[in-house]
């Protein structure tokens, strides 16, 4: 290894910076270009501020589209349509007629 001038900062040492500039390309070669490219492109880690995406506003005619949709029927109860009371009575009758012991 060549001797390095001790007065230079570590990030200014020869060979510490790649010869080509960083690009916005995400190909394999560019992802492994330097340590910064690897963390941002390869790993997807960025410590910068995240930009807020603005939500797309609905057009003014959106309420007319809501009216044209068919109404959904009321949700029906699942399971036994007779209800829980009758099913309990059936279980009680079965236990009375078929005693185990």
From Swiss-Prot:
Keywords from the named record: Acetylation, Activator, AIDS, Apoptosis, Host cytoplasm, Host nucleus, Host-virus interaction, Inhibition of host innate immune response by virus, Inhibition of host interferon signaling pathway by virus, Interferon antiviral system evasion, Isopeptide bond, Metal-binding, Methylation, Modulation of host chromatin by virus, Modulation of host PP1 activity by virus, Phosphoprotein, RNA-binding, Secreted, Transcription, Transcription regulation, Ubl conjugation, Viral immunoevasion, Zinc
Site note Essential for Tat translocation through the endosomal membrane, residues: 11
GO cellular component, one term: host cell nucleolus
Cysteine-rich: region residues: 22-37
Subunit structure: Interacts with host CCNT1. Associates with the P-TEFb complex composed at least of Tat, P-TEFb (CDK9 and CCNT1), TAR RNA, RNA Pol II. Recruits the HATs CREBBP, TAF1/TFIID, EP300, PCAF and GCN5L2. Interacts with host KAT5/Tip60; this interaction targets the latter to degradation. Interacts with the host deacetylase SIRT1. Interacts with host capping enzyme RNGTT; this interaction stimulates RNGTT. Binds to host KDR, and to the host integrins ITGAV/ITGB3 and ITGA5/ITGB1. Interacts with host KPNB1/importin beta-1 without previous binding to KPNA1/importin alpha-1. Interacts with EIF2AK2.
Positions carrying Asymmetric dimethylarginine: 52-53
Record lineage: Viruses, Riboviria, Pararnavirae, Artverviricota, Revtraviricetes
Motif position, Nuclear localization signal, RNA-binding (TAR), and protein transduction: 49-57
Domain of life, source organism: Viruses
Region (Transactivation): 1-48
Free-text comment on this protein's domains from its UniProt entry: The cell attachment site mediates the interaction with ITGAV/ITGB3 and ITGA5/ITGB1 integrins, leading to vascular cell migration and invasion. This interaction also provides endothelial cells with the adhesion signal they require to grow in response to mitogens.
Glycyl lysine isopeptide (Lys-Gly) (interchain with G-Cter in ubiquitin) cross-link, chain position(s): 71
Modified residues (N6-acetyllysine): 28, 50-51
Ranges of biased composition (kind: Basic residues): 48-57
A single MF term (Gene Ontology): cyclin binding
Protein known as: Protein Tat
Family: Belongs to the lentiviruses Tat family.
Region (Disordered): 1-20, 48-101
């Amino acid at each position: 290894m060549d001797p390095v001038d001790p007065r230079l900062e570590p990030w200014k040492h020869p060979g510490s910076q790649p010869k080509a500039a960083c690009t916005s390309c995400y190909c394999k070669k560019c992802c492994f270009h330097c340590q910064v490219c690897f963390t941002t492109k390869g790993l997807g880690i960025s410590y910068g501020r995240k930009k807020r995406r603005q939500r797309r506003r609905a057009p003014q005619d959106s309420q007319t589209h809501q009216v044209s949709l068919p109404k959904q029927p009321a949700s029906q109860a699942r399971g036994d349509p007779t209800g829980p009371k009758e099913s309990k009575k059936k279980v009680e009758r079965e236990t009375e007629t078929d005693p185990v012991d």
